[in-house]
Amino acid sequence: MSEAHIYPVKENIKAHTHADNDTYLAMYQQSVTDPEGFWSEHGKIVDWIKPFTKVKQTSFDTGHVDIRWFEDGTLNVSANCIDRHLAERGDDVAIIWEGDNPADDKTLTYNELYTEVCRFSNALKEQGVRKGDVVCLYMPMVPEAAVAMLACTRIGAVHTIVFGGFSPEALAGRIIDSDAKVVITADEGVRGGRAVPLKKNVDEALTNPEVKTISKVVVFKRTGGNIDWHEHRDVWWHEATAKVSDVCPPEEMKAEDPLFILYTSGSTGKPKGVLHTTGGYLVYATMTFKYVFDYQPGETFWCTADVGWITGHTYLVYGPLANGAKTILFEGVPNYPNTSRMSEVVDKHQVNILYTAPTAIRALMAKGNEAIEGTDRSSLRIMGSVGEPINPEAWEWYYKTIGNEKSPIVDTWWQTETGGILITPLPGATALKPGSATRPFFGVQPALVDNMGNVIEDQAAEGNLVILDSWPGQMRTVYGDHERFEQTYFSTFKGMYFTGDGARRDEDGYYWITGRVDDVLNVSGHRMGTAEIESALVAHPKIAEAAIVGIPHDIKGQAIYAYVTLNAGEYPTAELHKEVKDWVRKEIGPIATPDVLHWTDALPKTRSGKIMRRILRKIATGDTSNLGDTSTLADPSVVDKLIAEKAELV
């Protein structure tokens, strides 16, 4: 790939930052040489009921994986996100809700949020929810979703959120695995102008004979649409909260008490419930939010993620509110009712920090200047990217077009399992290279290992990305299956947390995530990350999106199969076919030239925007008899279209 352009730290950011480069280097050094001392000091970023005296008790040893932080301290998450701000900023806005329809919006101040959360906490208690019980949320993006999360944390219940786009089968599987006692949902959700039948899906999920633990379903009225009602089970949110007190003292929780379970979609098999606990998670969420986004008091923060994903948990709800920020909760999608919706929301609410995903950026980029029509986005100070590696071309477009070349981009790498951001630039400290997640956050010790598990000491290197020691936000276990936790994350490379990603490190020590290790191709003995070839393809001016998979090849071992979506107004031709192959040859080298170009209008994506490569691999190899679970796809019809197109390829 061509050498990346370097963007130095902006002077205006450096002048008011929490950490310039010297501060970052000093803090990072302390965090890895003296983690006890570092986290003993920075653990105080949250309020403790009983202060901790133990800081870090962690082991990655085979058969003894055990992760505990701040173990003897006690605290309450909702008190940290709400109560501690009331004296100073009770009348400040906590949550701005922007509806799917641009005419719908409302705000909640910290005082109002306190009242709502206390009321709903008491309502949950009335429905029989006790400390330690699991509550399942299957909610639209309305303020009540955040209220329900915070109410669970207030009374010591464990929430498990299932994204509102998941099917009844997927919902039932998560309810069964988590032993949830109550479901909180809405009559319907609204997204992109369409109603989502949430209550209907819950009703269907609860007909599964293996669902045995649910006693109540609390229903928030979002649309007033027609729904079935089960008299002894279903309860309206507004009725449940009308007759209870608006005072609810926060439950004193131990640092290692479970806070939430969040299921990651394993491509096959039983859902994997990632368990996060109270103290370490909140410290890490609060700390990363403050430093990564260089948050300054009074700023407005917009994370476009759904609360059903880890990004929504950590950087829409807990991180911003623990810091006393204004956080935007957006019900819609970035391109509805028009392509410039995201930019319009930025202007309307004077957003200072925008955190979104490469898939949204690329979708807008394909529409060119339509994405910013009639807006100036002058309020933006910091922009972020999350969810997958961002290719340099999309990075540059985001920086120049959305950000007017004045907002640094924090390209953040992390996972559901990590609780918070692990590798990232800091706005006032890090010179930026488009496409690189740059350097580790405080306390995070990344390393590259070869396939035998040997740490690669060279500065410039490529290998499997591992983390050598624990950090406070790390998941503690797979719910109900600690053996699976050890097996999945600690057995491949002994004594290390294996991320499942490959990465390269450049001569400046910057990390470049190359994609999942199972997305590594081996062509004639050459290892190549699919992300690198995809980046080269997307850099072509006519290409909107690309996905690469490997298919078996008699001579090369693997051949390169490229799915390519063109920009609006472009059409596949024989000339373009040759041009694209020549382009990749020029960008990376002959070894990376795609063997097959499969033109298509759309790629199969989950509702969080991730491309389902597992399905693409099967279609490319002609193995379409068992495509596995397609219930998490945003548009399942894409699959049949791809299979038909594949049949027509010579």
UniProtKB/Swiss-Prot annotation:
Spell out the GO cellular component terms annotated for this protein, sorted alphabetically and separated by semicolons. cytosol
User: Which processes are annotated in GO (biological process)?
Assistant: acetyl-CoA biosynthetic process from acetate
Reproduce the UniProt comment on modification after translation: Acetylated. Deacetylation by the SIR2-homolog deacetylase activates the enzyme.
State which Enzyme Commission number(s) the record gives.
6.2.1.1
The record's section on PROSITE patterns has: AMP_BINDING
Q: Which domain of life is it from?
A: Bacteria
Q: Provide the cofactor list for this protein.
A: Mg(2+)
What's the stated role of this polypeptide? Catalyzes the conversion of acetate into acetyl-CoA (AcCoA), an essential intermediate at the junction of anabolic and catabolic pathways. AcsA undergoes a two-step reaction. In the first half reaction, AcsA combines acetate with ATP to form acetyl-adenylate (AcAMP) intermediate. In the second half reaction, it can then transfer the acetyl group from AcAMP to the sulfhydryl group of CoA, forming the product AcCoA.
NCBIfam families on file: Ac_CoA_lig_AcsA (TIGR02188), PRK00174.1 (NF001208)
- PANTHER family to which the protein is assigned, alphabetical: ACETYL-COENZYME A SYNTHETASE
Q: Which family does it belong to?
A: Belongs to the ATP-dependent AMP-binding enzyme family.
Question: HAMAP family annotated for this entry?
Answer: Ac_CoA_synth
The protein, known as: Acetyl-coenzyme A synthetase
Q: Which organism encodes this protein?
A: Vibrio vulnificus (strain YJ016)
